[in-house]
Amino acid sequence: MSKKARPPIPTLDGKIIETHCHLDYLSGDELAGTINKSRDVGVEKIITIAVSEENQAVVREIAESDPNIWCTQGLHPHEAASWSAAFGQELRSNAAHPKVLAIGEIGLDYYYEHADPNTQIAAFEGQIAIAVEHNKPVVIHTREAEEDTKTVLSSVSTALSKKGVIHSFTSSLDLAEFCLSEGFYLGFNGIATFKNAENVREVIRKTPIERILLETDAPYLTPVPYRGVPNAPFYLPFIAQTVADLKQVSVEELLSVTYQNSLDCFF
């Protein structure tokens, strides 16, 4: 689809919380413009996600700059080799920051070999322990690691009182059912609009609307009809419409329920 053929971005008739994006890829006027444009289409709050040792402070600074932006702290599984006792102490301190809502993006990713499984598991478990200490939810990334994800979550879900979300869910229905049974939310994004993502759409159809969170994972995974350009929170209306259609509810109902889900999970 050419740029000229792309439809305008709808303005949502309801509030929405962007539960997962990476605003640290933007700065200056581009960051300000993205935030303003997102508000114009109905995005009320934005959660920007930490992934590496280097960007912990950056996302906190972005959150501090705006009353409706919040953040997380944690190491992505690709960055698991950075996990150490010293980083753990830093994370404990940062978790108490008033704009830090959750520990994440943490988890397991065996699709890429950025860190070996044992290193990833150690970082995952260590960061979950800090979430338990601070009564924070977790933002989990899992890819090609279903059994180890189940094993880790089975051992901690009782202690993890606020649970959290399996973000950008693309795994099996079996893992979805397990995570739901353990009390976690599932996060869905532009992948749901992709032609070859029928597996994700099937999980959405079978996930109770009360357990769904909406996200973009910007600047990645831009939804159709804007696929091919950098993603941003202001594309959430296309994701909301797709999920509403799959759940056979109005966009207004979806927004009402997922807004409350987001509050319950993070705030």
Regions found by a protein language model. Give the residues of each.
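Mid-domain alpha/beta scaffold segments of enzyme catalytic cores
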Residues: 1-267
